[in-house]
Amino acid sequence: MNGERHVAGRGRRRRPDGVRDVVEPRIAVAVVTMGNRPAEVDALLESVAKQDLAPARIVIVGNGCRLPEFAQRLSLPGEVTTVDVEENLGCPGGRNVALARLREYGDIDVVVELDDDGLLVDADVLRRVRDLYAADPRLGIVAFRIADEKGETQQRHVPRVGNSDPMRGGYVTGFLGGAHALNMEMLAGTGGWPAEFFFAHEETDLAWRAADADWKILYAPELLLRHPRTSPARHAIYYRVTARNRVWLVRRRLPLVLIPVHLGVWSLLTLLRTRSADGLRAWLGGFVEGLREPAGERRPMRWRTVWRLTRLGRPPVI
């Protein structure tokens, strides 16, 4: 590397094969935080500042908190925007705030969303993201690989069924909420995050909408976010909200005939895997809540999307 640093601006460059010019997408980075991880947020933003392709914009959302000054203190590149939200809107709601601000600016093509306690280890992540989107105009979502401090990737962080190799990239049916890139043109058609979910399964809702609109979802393990090893059950609301949102998800997105199949398979797996009696009680309460409460707009996927997801290795009943 020659030490040069570029800003992610929309321009044209010649492809290596010399066939045609490629439009370079403008990249933004969005981070949502509740203000309880100041050191981790600083470290994450410093890792963004070290990228060899600087983002055109950085948006930081304080989800129910007031944010400190970041831009000058951390020498952040690009245009830096902070947004304080009075109440905690949950992760999807907070990310919608960032997306709304980026839409107002109207000059961003791809947004990279990162968990506030993650860290970009490599300096070429944003450049690689830019190149992936420049090469494929129908690329909707890029899923990063998430690994802990030891470099290990938990199986739940691999967007495939079964014990899949975390280093095997390719097209998939879902993505990880902790680190990913989203095509702004795609979001204009599919809509943003399901804010009412607050936490859990919001990625699947967005992924299914993207797939149904014929956008591609790519798992790119070379794009690494280091993240502390955690369990989703660490959240007090985990069992209830996971169950409620799963029911909402299938009510919103699946053809009617597949809804009982999906819920039956998922319920059986939950009963086999869950060892906590309190957790099962909370899960059952969430399941009932998901059936009783409005699930939001019903927009079931087409049967050809069901087949496409099945061919990619994850039929939407698992």
Label the predicted regions.
Residues 241, 256-318:
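Non-catalytic, C-terminal membrane-associated alpha-helical segments of glycosyltransferases
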Residues 107-119:
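Short beta-strand-to-loop acidic/aromatic patch adjacent to the donor-nucleotide binding site
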Residues 123-154:
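Conserved donor NDP-sugar-binding/catalytic core segment of glycosyltransferases
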Residues 85-105:
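Glycine-rich, basic loop-to-helix element that forms the pyrophosphate-binding segment
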Residues 174-182, 186-191, 196-224:
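A short, conserved alpha-helix in the catalytic core of glycosyltransferases
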Residues 213-237, 248-249:
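Active-site donor/metal-binding and catalytic loop motifs
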Residues 148, 164-182, 204, 234:
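A recurrent flexible, glycine/aromatic-enriched loop bordering the glycosyltransferase active site
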Residues 46-55:
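Short, acidic, metal-binding catalytic loop of nucleotide-sugar glycosyltransferases
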